[in-house]
Structure formats: C-alpha cells, structure tokens
C-alpha cells in the first residue's frame, strides 16, 4: 500500500504534464477549418478525451489496483523474474553507455545539431522530390474514364465508340460491373473491380493496359483514372485556372503556350484544356430588302423554321380517347447539314410557300464549345493527370505562367489542386502552434522556461528525423525498393507528425522532472540526470514500445483506406522508435547544458541560505559523485 502511495505521489507531476501535453497537441488539429478540420476534428477530440481519461485513471485507479493486485516478491520468480533480470542487464548496459555520453558531451551536442539539421533539410527537400500530395492514392476498386468526342459528333457516333470502350473494361479479368453515361460530345464511364479479398492485382496495375486499349479506339478520346481519395475533387488531379478580363481567345492563347511547355517537360500523362474553339456554328442571314419585297412576316418566318427543326409541340389531338402531342419536324435525312436549311419553305402572303434560300444565306463559323467563368472573370482551365507529383506539376505550371502571362492575369485552382494549395500549406502553422502550446504547458508545470527547451529540443528534432526518413526515401510511383515501407508527405502524415510531438515529449518529461526532484534532495546535477535516466528507463521503454506496437499494425494493413493508415502508422512508428533511442542519450546531455541548479533552491527553501552564506561551503563538502566504471551510473559518494 505504501509503495503504491509513494509511486503515485512521485509520478503525479509527470502524469499531469504528459496528460496536458498530449491533450494540448491535438488542439490545433481540432481548431483547423477546411477539409483537414472536417477529416480530423473528431480524431483530435476523441484522442484528447481519451488521454484525459487515461490520466485520471493513472492517478486514481492504477495506484489502487497496484496496492491490491501486486504481491511482494512475485517479481523475482517465474516469467516475471526472467523479464526483470533481462531488463536489469539492459539497464546496466544503458547506464554504461550513458556514462560515456555524459563524459563526451561536446560530441553529443555536435551529433544532436547534425541530426536536427538533417531533419530540417529533409523536410525542405521532401516536397521537391515529388512526394508531396494532398492524400495518398487509395485502392478503391474503381476506375473512371472521361470521354471527349469531337464537337460535331452525334449522339449515335459517341455511343458507338463509348460502347467499344465499355467492352475494354468488361474484358478485364477482375471486373465486377461497368457503367457508362454518354452525351453528344462527352461522356463518363468506368468499372468496379471485385472486392480486395477476391482479387490479387491492385487497381493501379490495370491502368496501363486499359489506356493502351482505349487509345486504339477512334472517334473519342478517353483516359482512365483512379478517383481521388478525398471528396470535392474534379475529374483530374491537376486543375490550373487562368482568369482575366481579357477575351476568351486571348486567354486561350496563353494557356496553350503554358500547356505546350508542360507537355515538352513531360509533366502530364494526359492533359487537356477545357476551352475548345472547335464548335461549328451556322447562322441564317436574311436579306431584309428581299424580305420586304416579298411581304414576309419575320415572326412567321421564325416560327416556320423553329417548327421545322426545333421539335417543339404545337397542340394536341385525340384518337380513340387518347391525347397526343403534335410535334412538327422535317425528316432527319433532310437536316443533316446546315446547307439543307435552304430547302425549308416558309409562309408568305396569301399562304404562299417560299424557299428559304430566296431570302437568306447560311454563314458558317467556329466558336467555343463553352465560355467558362470563375470569380466573375473569363477563365481557361488546364487539367490532366500528372506524370510527376501533383505539387511538382502545379509548381511547374505556376513558374511558366509567371514567365508567360502579362499583368492583369490571375491564377487559381479547383478540385484537388485547390485543396492541396489550401490544406497542404497549413502544416507548418499547426506544427508551430503545437510546439508553442506544449512549451507553455510545460513552462507552467515546471515553473521554468529552461526545462521545456530541454524536453522539446532533446526529443522533437530527433523524432522528426526518424519520421522524415520514411518520407525522404519515398520515390514517385513506386520506382524504388523502399516504396512498401515509405509514405508521401500528405495530410495524414502531417497529422502523424503533430501527434508525434506529444508522444515523444513525454520521454523527456519523465527524465527532466525526476532529475529536478533529485537535485532538490541535494544531489548534484550530473548525478541527478544520470540517475533519473536510469530509473526512468523502464517506464520510457514500456510506453514507447507499447506505442510502437499499437501503431505497427497500421503499417501492415491492406485494402480500403490502407494508404492513409499506412501513412500515419509509418510516421508514428519510425518517429517514435528513432526518437526514443536518441532521446535517452541526448536529453541528459542537454540537461547538463541548459538546466539550472535546483539543489541551491532546495537549500534556500529549507532556510539554509543564511548559513550557506556565512560558512561558504567548500567544494569538498558538496555531495561528491563517482562513476563505478561498471555501467552502474553516477552515484553520490
């Protein structure tokens, strides 16, 4: 019972600090807006609540259970005895190596600075390696195909070619069913694959062979894509919008120049410009002099033309009790091309029928299929599937646009590209806010600005280095052997990095808090930190191994949502493993560099300040330290 009470009183400070730290680190995530906030707000609030409850349990139920369930002496026998003796040997090994690092602190500082600098360099270089994206591509078991047909294509032509594309999807071995939606000059189709447990081939493996077969179909242009892992995306990942008050043709000229540069640089697997000036348009031009000479009524002429080709109903008639619409329209064979309009007869005076060619001519021109606008400005959009990362593709388009576009043109984005621009740039602010919150919490808990620096500097950069390795080794499109155990820099890995800050900080909290307590008991700083690191080794290893073991299954999952879970799991496992190993040796050395002497404060608190000033204690009367040299650490002599 007494042991449980002593242990609870000894750990109440670290438990409170770790609980508040872990809860505070999720606050910036919960406060985010946009897509990231919508995705992770519940995640952050749930974990913050779970951490708080865990802290309450650790301070109340755990001591009670320890007092009633643990028996004295049971740790020396059986399996528990084997585990304890093994850990004692590991602690002795750690103690001997810790002594060496404390005796070679300058080398430790150089190593710490080098690893921290490497972590900064990695996160600066990772986006340039082509591995930054909004979210990792998920195997959703679906492939979409976007159909583009010529502007003058008929619905029958488009359906015929789209059916041929549908057969390509149907012939894939793992096809479950296909779907198709066709319009005169565009369409949409695709396939749904069999469940993940039935098929062995991933969805993306089918894309090259599908594209090769679709490319051989004449009459339409169709490119297969995997749907975005996040909601709100357009048909294609790249959606780069050029807006201006200039006319559409002028904007299109600049867009074609930028698009040509991108194709030359092999930025796109497939690319397109939404504004196409290829729509044939015919206009009936009337000779008003002839119309007046023949006494034609233009309103009646318009009604006659509309009735002939428009397909509008004029009235109803009844047959055998049923009502039917009357829809006048000339035969299709007589309206296949605009020149045939001249053969239409219009009503003249006294119900005379006059050929339209008598009073009108046909004017042909080419216009844009559609005139698009964005933010009340004329807009032209460059879209496509990038051959590089989405971030690299957008960066290239931005650079070329800045070189080509004159003043008065504004760049914008839609779909996944907009999400990447808005959500992908929030990480630094959220990360820094998390560090500030943790620092303030620790400063209040330790009543010091030095101790939070020791905890954060001794753990966070090293954990970031460990997590960054799994993103630094990521190569675009799986072209490297490390692809299975690496992840991209995306919103899931970013949330993992923020979470990692709170998880790895608790290691430093345990060491620093206990070292301060030892100093207040009269132990010198060097002996205090050496003893604190040895004593706190077991709880640090227990919590760290439990964290790694709990997240390791995320690195092994497959199927729906696997990429997102892999991303979080790899960041937490890698960062926690490497961060914990380094923290055990770096934090003690940084403590010697930054921490203040607490044993002087303890003397003053005990009312010894005046006596100390009068006697001027000699150095030899201070608590002496010695290392036994056998790995048992620093002891007070």
Annotate each language-model stretch with its function:
Residues 27, 31, 49, 440-536, ...:
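Hydrophobic transmembrane alpha-helices and their membrane-interface caps
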Residues 112, 119-124, 141-151, 186-198, ...:
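Short, hydrophobic beta-strand segments
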């Amino acid at each position: 019972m007494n042991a449980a009470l002593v242990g609870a009183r000894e750990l109440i400070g670290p438990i409170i600090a770790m609980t508040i730290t872990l809860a505070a680190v999720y606050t910036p995530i919960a406060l985010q807006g946009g897509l990231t906030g919508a995705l992770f707000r519940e995640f952050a609030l749930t974990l913050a609540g779970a951490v708080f409850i865990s802290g309450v349990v650790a301070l109340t139920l755990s001591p009670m259970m320890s007092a009633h369930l643990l028996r004295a002496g049971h740790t020396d026998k059986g399996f528990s005895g084997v585990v304890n003796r093994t850990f004692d040997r590991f602690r002795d090994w750690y103690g001997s190596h810790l002594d060496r690092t404390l005796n070679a602190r300058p080398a430790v500082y150089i190593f710490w600075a080098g690893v921290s600098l490497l972590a900064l360099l990695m996160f600066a270089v990772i986006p340039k390696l082509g591995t930054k994206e909004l979210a990792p591509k998920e195997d959703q078991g679906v492939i979409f195909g976007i159909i583009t047909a010529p502007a003058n294509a008929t619905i029958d032509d488009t359906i015929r070619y789209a059916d041929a594309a549908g057969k390509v999807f149907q012939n894939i071995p793992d096809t479950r069913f296909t779907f198709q939606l066709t319009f005169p000059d565009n369409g949409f189709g695709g396939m749904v694959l069999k469940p993940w447990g039935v098929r062995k081939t991933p969805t993306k493996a089918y894309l090259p062979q599908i594209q090769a077969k679709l490319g051989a179909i004449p009459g339409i242009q169709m490119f297969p894509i995997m749907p975005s892992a996040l909601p709100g995306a357009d048909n294609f990942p790249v959606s780069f919008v050029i807006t201006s008050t200039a006319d559409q043709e002028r904007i299109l000229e600049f867009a074609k120049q930028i698009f040509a540069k991108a194709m030359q640089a092999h930025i796109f697997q497939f690319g397109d410009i939404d504004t196409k000036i290829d729509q044939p348009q015919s206009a009936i031009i009337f000779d008003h002099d002839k119309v007046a000479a023949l006494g034609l009524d233009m309103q009646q002429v318009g009604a006659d033309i509309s009735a002939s080709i428009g397909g509008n109903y004029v009235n109803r008639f009844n047959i055998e009790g049923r009502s039917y619409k009357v829809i006048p329209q000339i035969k299709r064979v007589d309206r296949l091309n605009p020149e045939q309009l001249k053969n239409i007869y219009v009503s003249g005076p006294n119900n005379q029928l006059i050929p339209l060619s008598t009073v009108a001519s046909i004017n042909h021109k080419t216009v844009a299929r559609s005139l698009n606008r964005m933010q009340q400005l004329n807009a032209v959009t460059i879209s496509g599937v990038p051959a590089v990362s989405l971030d690299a593709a957008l960066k290239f388009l931005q650079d070329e646009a800045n070189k080509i576009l004159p003043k008065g043109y504004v760049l914008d984005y839609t779909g996944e590209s907009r999400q990447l621009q808005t959500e992908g740039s929030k990480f630094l602010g959220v990360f820094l806010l998390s560090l500030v919150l943790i620092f303030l919490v620790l400063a209040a808990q330790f009543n010091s600005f030095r101790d939070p620096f020791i905890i954060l500097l001794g753990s966070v950069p090293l954990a970031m280095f460990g997590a960054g390795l799994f993103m630094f080794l990521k190569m675009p499109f799986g072209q490297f052997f490390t692809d299975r155990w690496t992840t991209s820099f995306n919103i899931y890995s970013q949330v993992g990095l923020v979470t990692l800050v709170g998880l790895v900080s608790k290691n430093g909290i345990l060491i620093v808090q206990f070292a301060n307590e030892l100093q207040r008991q009269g132990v010198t700083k060097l002996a205090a930190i050496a003893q604190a690191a040895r004593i706190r080794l077991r709880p640090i290893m227990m919590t760290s191994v439990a964290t790694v073991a709990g997240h390791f299954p995320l690195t092994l999952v497959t199927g729906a949502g696997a990429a997102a879970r892999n991303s979080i799991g790899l960041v937490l496992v890698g960062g926690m493993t490497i961060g914990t190993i380094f923290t055990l040796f770096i934090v003690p050395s940084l403590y010697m560099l930054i921490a203040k002497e607490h044993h002087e404060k303890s003397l003053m608190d005990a009312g010894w300040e005046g006596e100390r000033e009068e006697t001027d204690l000699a150095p030899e009367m201070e608590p002496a330290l010695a290392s036994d040299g056998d790995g048992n650490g620093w002891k007070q002599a």
